[in-house]
């Protein structure tokens, strides 16, 4: 039995019946107006209308009637939930409205009629749901009513808020479109030809290998020789992908934070992603042919000749890889990896057959005996501005670190000039420049200390009795060094005094500006207090004013936060400017020293010509004595000597 929930008034079926011909209207049957169907239409004492002929007498109650009674109770409960609806068996079609005979025969509401076995079966299989279109219409109607209620409840302030929120949502969509057009794409390192990766990520020491390969091999040489099943056990994929993404961005992650299996998987991934075979397509068949030679000597000679024909980068990477894996095989007791295991792992990775790999591993000394795995030293970092980094102590260490930093500086300049806008690279550029300034200053101090120790040792070893002309010549060199140091110190002091005067003038102007700003702040505060006292009498507790105050408070907090960020940037810029000034002072000192040396070299030939013109009267003064006199005269004439005692 299907149930269609039909509204009591203006249903579509009634309209169709009314529109058809003969103007006949359907009279409700006795079942449709039964008191059990519509309780409340009849009084309780009145007898109910006669039932249909198909119903059985009430005294015989069968099992079917009991089941039917249960269904009737359920139907009554459902009626209470849906008031104003009637349950019909079928909607009357237009054909029924046309013929009156059909109207009389039409069975109305068969709720209490005992169905036959076939009808009961049909009723159980019919669907008791509304059509989908009617449900969709009802949902739309409910949504429209909900929107109408909301629009009625909204106030003017809510409408303004909604308009502002829509405006804010629209604005940021248009802004980020412009920088996305200019941002160049960063090329990856994995999957590119070996020569390109070498040109982009080669280390400072000039070894033509990619940085990812060098760093992975160094790490595995340190930490992977005691790991069981190395290069056979795979690392964690998420960590391998993380390292791969970092190297693709041309960063240098700290591999010490990862496990050996993860780094080994990263190295295998790089070798697997190489677009070309290490032995090249042209030479690969010839390597296979060389494996078929009869004697081992012929195999080695043919392999040596073929390896010389390989490109430089391919030959170098292959030699480093074979030597490194030979170290792994040498630690077989700890790594559990022999030649067979390494060949099984490496063959699908580098696309080289097991026969060729076996020859390479069994003749490492003959083929790659001169290869030495050079350890990479990372450049010095100065991440924390509050502390000074630990600089090398010896001159050789300082010069080596300067070479590393200058190589890194050139790479950063090349990337930034290529159009790649990266804030992290710009910050690293400033960091490298600061480190270079500190290293050069430390190198000068080390040279000065070395000269002083040399002079002290020479003075201590000298004795007054054993003074000769050869020793005097050696002392002249010491005197010249001392004079050069004195000149350098004097010129540097002059530049520092000039910088001091400039900074004092700047400080005075800044103090005046601070006083002016304080006066303005005091004046504004007094005006605000005066304005508050006037407005307190006429102030009203309106919602709009409180909202404006909240917005102003938010704007004020935002401005304060921006001001703090600008102050931090200003401090960084001031530090950088100060370092650049120090570098300029050093360059000026060097220029002045070069000018003084050039002037001395021009004066020396003139002094040598004068005694020749005089006829050789009197012996020429010693060069060392002349230099001492010239230095003393310059020291007297220089104004920096009078300023030595002035505090800086």
Curated annotation (Swiss-Prot):
EC number in record: 7.6.2.2, 7.6.2.3
Domain Rho-GAP: 192-380
PTM entry text: Tyrosine-phosphorylated upon stimulation of cells with EGF. May undergo proteolytic cleavage to give peptides which reassemble to form a transporter complex.
Chain positions with Phosphoserine modification: 29-30, 34, 48, 62, 92-93, 461, 463, 638
Residue stretches of biased makeup (Basic residues): 69-79, 102-118
Function: Multifunctional protein that functions as a downstream effector of RALA and RALB. As a GTPase-activating protein/GAP can inactivate CDC42 and RAC1 by stimulating their GTPase activity. As part of the Ral signaling pathway, may also regulate ligand-dependent EGF and insulin receptors-mediated endocytosis. During mitosis, may act as a scaffold protein in the phosphorylation of EPSIN/EPN1 by the mitotic kinase cyclin B-CDK1, preventing endocytosis during that phase of the cell cycle. During mitosis, also controls mitochondrial fission as an effector of RALA.
Stretch list, region Mediates interaction with REPS1 and REPS2: 500-648
Annotated spans, Disordered: 1-158, 525-552, 598-648
InterPro entries: RALBP1, RalBP1-like_Ral-bd, Rho_GTPase_activation_prot, RhoGAP_dom
Notes on the domains: The Rho-GAP domain mediates the GTPase activator activity toward CDC42.
Subunit structure: Interacts with the GTP-bound form of RALA (via effector domain); during mitosis, recruits RALBP1 to the mitochondrion where it promotes DNM1L phosphorylation and mitochondrial fission. Interacts with DNM1L; mediates its mitotic kinase cyclin B-CDK1-mediated phosphorylation during mitosis to promote mitochondrial fission. Interacts with the mitotic kinase cyclin B-CDK1 during mitosis. Interacts with the GTP-bound form of RALB (via effector domain). Interacts with REPS1; the interaction is direct and does not affect RALA-binding nor GTPase activator activity of RALBP1.
Site, Arginine finger: residue positions: 232
Chain residues that bind ATP: 69-74, 418-425
Primary localization: membrane
Mediates association with membranes and could form transmembrane domains, as annotated region: 154-219
Protein name: RalA-binding protein 1
An annotated GO cellular component: plasma membrane
Keyword ATP-binding (UniProt): yes
Phosphothreonine: residues bearing it: 44
Biased composition (Polar residues): 24-33
Tissue expression profile of the protein: Ubiquitous. The highest level of expression was observed in ovaries and skeletal muscle, whereas the lowest was found in spleen, liver and peripheral blood leukocytes.
